[in-house]
Design a protein with these regions (language model features):
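Beta-lactam-recognizing serine transpeptidase/beta-lactamase-like catalytic domain environment
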Residues: 92-93, 97-101, 142-185, 190-295
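Solvent-exposed, polar/charged alpha-helical surfaces in well-ordered, non-transmembrane soluble domains
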Residues: 48, 52, 56, 66, ...
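Extracellular/periplasmic catalytic domains that process cell-envelope and extracellular macromolecules
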Residues: 44-48, 107, 131-132, 142, ...
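Generic short beta-strand
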Residues: 86, 136-139, 149
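Alpha-helix C-terminal capping segments
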Residues: 27-34, 125-133, 195
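Conserved, well-ordered alpha-helix/loop/beta-strand core segments that scaffold catalytic motifs
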Residues: 96-136
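Short N-terminal helix-loop-first-beta-strand/juxtamembrane motif that initiates sensory/input modules
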Residues: 36-37, 131-143
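Small/polar-residue-rich segments within soluble enzyme cores
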Residues: 2-110
Length: 295
């Protein structure tokens, strides 16, 4: 048994080497032999775990420690099949002669939790994240419903072997999708919404690939000129210069008000004990400098 057990299992085998009472240990292959019986049980996270940072993980006692495993523990603990190994023992606690342990399965009948994630989109997002970044995240939302279709954080971890990641210097247990970031181009729809509400949608900007505000140069991606763009074209091409000019027309108070209404600067609570970082949204009065506001 020893070569096919985990380190924790090997320690248990050593501790129990002279034990007479039945005990359980996890092994990686069928090693049925005299006095040992193997039973196949489903892995909680499957052979290729997905969305580990969002789902979280369990401790050695089967209690949720992080992510949805912790936030929804009361609900999740009552779902799924429950396996019990029943042994007939004598007065000394030894397995009775001529008997074998019996695996008894029962189903709680509870329905569990269904997420909005798409398995295919999640798997694709995780593959792209691993291939293109050392540290970061990819979020995919359904534009029509705002349902989260993918929530990938990299580097990731194996929820079946969390101990291997506990002291890793790149902090794989952190869900980077829930951290605070400089918003970048994600903020452009906020400016567009504020402009639509204020009736200021007529701005046309001849983009040379950059914009100068108080002597500070703000470039479009790669410094590529977009030419003459209106609001729709600026959104399509993600023109930095256009939205800097639009923000100047709207003013910091109007822009900040729309950002607050759309949820910027506050945490999003997804479940008990599971929230995103709030981030920081500066007060309008701190943006008196045109350069600071543009940034």
């Amino acid at each position: 048994l020893y070569p096919y057990a985990s380190k924790a299992g090997q320690a248990m085998l050593y501790q129990k080497r002279n034990a007479s009472r039945p005990f359980l240990v996890e092994v990686t292959r069928d090693v049925s032999a005299m006095g040992a019986w193997c039973y196949a049980v489903p892995r909680r996270y499957g052979d290729a775990p997905l969305a580990s940072a969002l789902l979280g993980y369990l401790d050695g006692e089967g209690h949720g420690v992080a992510g949805l495993e912790a936030a929804l523990e009361d609900l999740l603990s009552g779902t799924g099949a429950q396996d019990k190994l029943v042994c007939a023992v004598n007065a000394q606690g030894k397995l009775r002669s001529g008997t074998e342990p019996e695996l008894v399965k029962s189903d709680s009948g509870a329905v569990g939790v269904q997420l909005t994630l798409s398995r295919s989109i999640q798997r694709a997002a995780e593959a792209v994240a691993v291939q293109t970044m050392q540290s970061g995240c990819i979020l995919v939302l359904d534009a029509a419903s705002a349902k989260v279709r993918a929530c990938a954080s990299t580097p990731g971890f194996d929820p079946e072997n969390v101990s291997a990641s506990l002291n890793a210097p790149d902090s794989p247990l952190v869900n980077r999708a829930f951290q605070a970031y400089a918003v970048g181009s994600v903020f452009k729809p906020v400016l567009a919404a504020a402009a639509l509400e204020a009736g200021k949608t007529g701005l046309v900007w001849d983009c040379p690939g950059y914009c100068v505000v108080d002597g500070q140069v703000f470039r479009c991606a790669g410094g590529v000129p977009h030419g003459e763009v209106d609001l729709a074209a600026a959104l399509q091409k993600s023109c930095n210069g256009y939205f800097i000019r639009l923000g100047q027309e709207l003013g910091p108070e109007r822009v900040r008000e729309m950002a607050v209404r759309l949820g910027f600067g506050r945490a999003l609570n997804l479940a008990d004990t599971l929230s995103t970082a709030a981030g920081q949204l500066p007060e309008a009065e701190t943006l008196t400098s045109s350069g600071a506001f543009a940034n």
